[in-house]
């Protein structure tokens, strides 16, 4: 340990320019920096996990796992854990999240949507929090350091993985960007660095990150026109809550908080603790001897000696029997502001937050430069205010708070309630991109679904298909230039149940798959009695026969209809064929023959809405089957073109009331992903939905679930199914419309989605009486 502390001491050279203030001596291609005579450092970035909203048991598990991580730190190296609040890079944000204008009629909506996104981005959440762990070690040369980091890095990544956090090493340009963004706040977009180019031209890498000027005074410093101050944790409370770090870094300013950890080898720690305990015991014995000399044989030991003895025994027990390690820790923090007045106010706010936790922060006097270099993730430590802690007491400074979801090219779903950051998610990046939107009536389900439809229509080139049983989507679909297909017995629009393209068969003969579909259809039409083997054979033979000409013409020309299929049945000699023909007559040549005619609507529009409000009870089961089959047709067609398809099914529980449509939907749910399609089920009747085993399986297998305000019985069912803690349940209990929980993969995040009311898009999305378009 003494050697390690000695290695941290370096001769102070008076900096002759701003470059000399930066303590990096050399940088290497793999992200290793030389930060001392023979000291090398490497930084890893790790993602946040849902600690703040986890249940008590989960928090304990995370705490113990984090303690394990601290225990695994090598005692021959110094570890620095840094939380960096950096300003949102506006240009990057605009490039990745704003919708590009396309010069068509929908541009007015794109501009409106972009205005809303910019308002959200420049509000309270203009700060992004990033977390790093920097390991620095003294080695003879960079090769030795490289081998060391390769070993330690793999271990570190595995430990973070067990916590549910992704950890990755930073490249040299990524590390330099951290310093550039801090030194040159407001110029984030101007960072350009190519290590090979720099080396070829003989440029100094420090020129790319250093500010124009730096000025250090007694208790603050100035970088360019900005002011900054470094604080350190002077006094620790006896009991600290695990939320302290999260609260300290909650300030909406550029700041960095670093915890330097120096693990002490356990044998040295035990020796030190034993000698301290021996000292306390000696004091106690001497005190007792003095009392005995005064004939005071019944005297009690003074409280302070008793307390010292108790604490030393506990400390020694921690080290020897409870698997704790002794650590030295230094906690430093640097924050910046535009004016001196603002800086003083921020300092006071931070000191007040610390006092709330009974800790005392102090301002570093005449050590601002050393403090700055310690707080930033260079891998150096110039501040000596050590505090001896055990693993457990150090783990209280847990750097985790809440997970943020920000995928590139994603859809905006609202703001994270805890971090106030935007939730931008892309279902295509998940293993299974199917989605459910659940919530009571008036909770904001349709609003959420419409928001997603709008984003997909305005942003990309994917096709969107909506099944609308309540006629809620018509104004939106019309405004976005989509096609509304009204389906009913009396409607002039028809969809041919036998429509089929060459991709329908998933690489095999499409007629085989279509034959299965027609069997389901006939079972449904005949009255739900299972078909016998003879009937199935007849249906299969007739299906192949009616499609023969269409297939021979290379899937061009006129597609056969159910009327052709019935005519083919009547040609067969078996009496069973005549029975089937008679049973389906009502739906082919009778008054419910809407699906037995050629399709006469444009099903090639990018945005299609199937309006099934007027579909009667008799037609509903067959209607749902035909619509779902028509969707499958479209999906397979799009797959061949390499195009995504998004399907939105409102009031999905209606489909589960009929066995065939439920099974067809289940198959669709499982298969659509490989076709590049993503299905969304929307319902308020979670209880009804979960009665169906099929629906239950679909919900459990969906990686993307938006839960809005829930009824009490539904809440309990969802908590059981998705393992939601009581803390998390509070976000879907009696909350306003548009508030709830969003499950993205393994992340569960509380969100709020407030859309500006004075916009055209709001009027198209809302279903509140009197507010709609």
Q: What residues fall within each predicted segment?
A:
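Hydrophobic anchor at the beta1->P-loop junction of P-loop NTPases
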Residues: 437
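Hydrophobic positions on the alpha1 helix immediately C-terminal to the Walker A/P-loop
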Residues: 448
């Amino acid at each position: 340990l003494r050697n390690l502390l000695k290695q941290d001491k370096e001769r102070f050279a008076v900096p002759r320019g701003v470059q000399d203030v930066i303590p990096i001596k050399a940088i290497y291609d793999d992200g290793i920096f030389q930060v001392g005579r023979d000291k090398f450092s490497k930084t890893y970035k790790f993602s946040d996990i849902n600690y703040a909203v986890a249940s008590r048991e989960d928090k304990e598990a995370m705490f113990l796992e984090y303690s394990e991580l601290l225990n695994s730190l090598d005692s021959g190296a110094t570890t620095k854990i840094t939380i960096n609040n950096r300003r949102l890079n506006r240009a990057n944000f605009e490039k990745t999240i704003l919708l590009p204008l396309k010069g068509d009629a929908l541009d007015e909506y794109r501009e409106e949507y972009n205005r809303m996104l910019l308002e959200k981005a420049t509000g309270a959440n203009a700060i992004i929090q990033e977390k790093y762990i920097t390991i620095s070690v003294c080695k003879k040369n960079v090769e030795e350091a490289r081998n060391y980091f390769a070993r330690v890095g793999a271990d570190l990544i595995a430990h973070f993985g067990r916590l549910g956090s992704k950890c990755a090493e930073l490249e040299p340009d990524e590390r330099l960007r951290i310093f550039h963004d801090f030194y040159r706040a407001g110029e984030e977009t101007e960072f350009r660095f190519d290590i090979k180019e720099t080396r070829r031209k003989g440029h100094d890498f420090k020129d790319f990150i250093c500010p124009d000027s730096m000025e250090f005074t007694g208790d603050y410093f100035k970088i360019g026109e900005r002011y900054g101050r470094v604080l350190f944790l002077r006094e620790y409370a006896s009991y600290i809550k695990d939320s302290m770090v999260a609260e300290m870094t909650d300030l909406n300013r550029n700041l960095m908080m670093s915890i330097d950890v120096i693990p002490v080898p356990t044998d040295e720690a035990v020796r030190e603790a034993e000698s301290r305990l021996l000292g306390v015991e000696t004091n106690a014995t001497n005190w007792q001897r003095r009392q005995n000399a005064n004939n005071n044989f019944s005297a009690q030991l003074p409280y302070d000696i008793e307390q010292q003895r108790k604490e030393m025994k506990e400390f020694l027990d921690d080290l020897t029997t409870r698997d704790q390690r002794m650590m030295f820790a230094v906690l430093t923090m640097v924050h910046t502001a535009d004016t001196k007045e603002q800086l003083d106010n921020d300092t006071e706010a931070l000191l007040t937050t610390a006092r709330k936790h009974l800790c005392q922060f102090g301002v570093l006097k005449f050590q601002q430069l050393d403090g700055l270099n310690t707080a930033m993730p260079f891998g150096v430590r110039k501040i000596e205010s050590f505090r001896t802690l055990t693993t457990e007491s150090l783990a209280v400074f847990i750097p985790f708070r809440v997970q943020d979801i920000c995928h590139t090219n994603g859809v905006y779903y609202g703001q994270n309630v805890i971090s106030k950051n935007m939730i931008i998610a892309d279902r295509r990046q998940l293993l299974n991109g199917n989605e459910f939107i659940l919530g009571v009536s008036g909770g904001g389900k349709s609003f959420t679904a419409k928001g997603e439809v709008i984003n997909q229509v305005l942003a990309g080139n994917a096709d969107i298909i909506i099944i609308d049983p309540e006629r809620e989507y018509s104004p939106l679909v019309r405004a976005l230039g989509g096609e509304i297909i009204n389906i009913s017995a009396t409607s002039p629009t028809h969809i041919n149940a036998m429509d089929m393209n060459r991709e329908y068969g998933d690489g095999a003969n499409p007629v085989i798959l279509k034959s299965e579909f027609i069997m389901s259809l006939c079972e449904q039409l005949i009255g739900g009695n299972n078909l016998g083997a003879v009937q199935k054979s007849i249906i299969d033979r007739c299906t192949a026969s009616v499609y023969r000409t269409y297939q021979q013409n290379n899937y061009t020309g006129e597609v056969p209809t159910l009327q052709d299929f019935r005519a083919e049945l009547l040609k067969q000699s078996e009496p069973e064929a005549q029975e089937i023909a008679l049973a389906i007559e009502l739906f082919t040549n009778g008054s419910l023959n809407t699906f037995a005619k050629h399709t006469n609507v444009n099903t090639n529009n990018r945005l299609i809405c199937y309006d099934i409000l007027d579909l009667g009870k008799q037609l509903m089961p067959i209607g749902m089957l035909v619509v779902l089959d028509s969707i499958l047709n479209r999906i397979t067609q799009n797959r061949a073109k390499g195009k995504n398809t998004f399907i939105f099914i409102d009031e999905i529980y209606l489909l589960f009331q009929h066995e065939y449509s439920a099974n067809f939907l289940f198959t669709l749910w499982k298969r659509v992903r490989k076709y590049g399609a993503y299905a969304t089920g929307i319902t308020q009747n979670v209880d009804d939905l979960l009665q169906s085993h099929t629906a239950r399986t679909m919900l459990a297998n969906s990686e993307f679930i938006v839960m809005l305000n829930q009824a009490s019985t539904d809440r309990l069912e969802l908590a059981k199914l998705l393992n939601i803690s009581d803390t998390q349940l509070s976000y879907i209990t009696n909350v306003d419309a548009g508030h709830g929980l969003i499950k993205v993969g393994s992340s569960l995040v509380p969100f709020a989605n407030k859309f500006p009311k004075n916009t055209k898009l709001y009027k198209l999305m809302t279903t509140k009486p009197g507010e709609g378009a």
